[in-house]
Curated annotation (Swiss-Prot):
Family to which the UniProt record says this protein belongs: Belongs to the Frog skin active peptide (FSAP) family. Septenin subfamily.
GO cellular component: extracellular region
Main function: May act as an antimicrobial peptide.
Tissues showing expression: Expressed in skin glands.
Subcellular localization: Secreted
Taxonomy, superkingdom: Eukaryota
Naturally occurring in which organism (per UniProt): Osteopilus septentrionalis (Cuban treefrog)
Protein name listed in UniProt: Septenin 1a
Coiled-coil residue windows: none
Record lineage: Eukaryota, Metazoa, Chordata, Craniata, Vertebrata
Keywords: Secreted
């Protein structure tokens, strides 16, 4: 959900798939 690029990670409020 709404993944935001953070270096080489994907940060999201809720991790879904």
């Amino acid at each position: 959900s709404d993944a935001v690029a953070d270096g080489d990670h994907a940060i999201s409020g809720v991790v879904d798939s």
